[in-house]
Amino acid sequence: MATATDRAPHQVQVHTPTTQRVDVQRRGYDVSGGGVKTFLPDRGPSTSQIIAVLVGVPTGGTLLLLSGLSLLGTIIGLAIATPVFTFFSPVIVPAVVTIGLAVIGILTAGACGLTGLMSLSWMINFIRQVHGTTVPDQLDSAKRRMADMADYVGQKTKDAGQEIQTKAQDVKRSSS
């Protein structure tokens, strides 16, 4: 009678509609007798995987060491500071409360200022939409008004200059 190690592996041929041929070997048992070999990959890790491990392990180890030292320093600092905090708590607690309230007040003032600016911006945009004017239209209108004002001032200056010249000639004639 034949045993499981005497049998050859079964071959299966799969034909796909794209006429590609794929050979699949069913691996139930290894003919050479090593059952563990069927679970190992046929090829080793790629170069990028090796580089990732070579870079990642020392980096991760260093970061783990630093986090451990940080934890140790925190525990030592807490062990030293706890009696000091307990002794000075009548002074420290009111100071912390005062500083906390001051920080909360500053943050609240900033939030109110920011809310005010946002409200002002919303009102300006709302008024612009109601009047139907946009910034470029307003700039063009302002340019036209400035040009008109410059023409008006220029004309008034000419008129004033002519009036002064006329008065000067009148004074010159009357004195002669």
From Swiss-Prot:
It is found in: Lipid droplet; Membrane. Keywords: Acetylation, Allergen, Lipid droplet, Membrane, Transmembrane, Transmembrane helix. Expressed in seeds (at protein level). Not expressed in leaves. The modification N-acetylalanine is found at A2. The keyword Signal does not apply. Pfam families: Oleosin. InterPro entries: Oleosin (IPR000136). Residues 156-176 are annotated as: Disordered. It comes from the Eukaryota. GO terms for cellular component: membrane; monolayer-surrounded lipid storage body. The chain crosses the membrane at residues 61-81, 87-107. GO terms for biological process: lipid storage; response to freezing; seed oilbody biogenesis. The keyword Amino-acid biosynthesis does not apply. It is a multi-pass membrane protein. PANTHER family: OLEOSIN (PTHR33203), OLEOSIN 18.2 KDA (PTHR33203:SF63). Belongs to the oleosin family. May have a structural role to stabilize the lipid body during desiccation of the seed by preventing coalescence of the oil. Probably interacts with both lipid and phospholipid moieties of lipid bodies. May also provide recognition signals for specific lipase anchorage in lipolysis during seedling growth. Homodimer. Forms oligomers. This is Oleosin Ara h 14.0102.
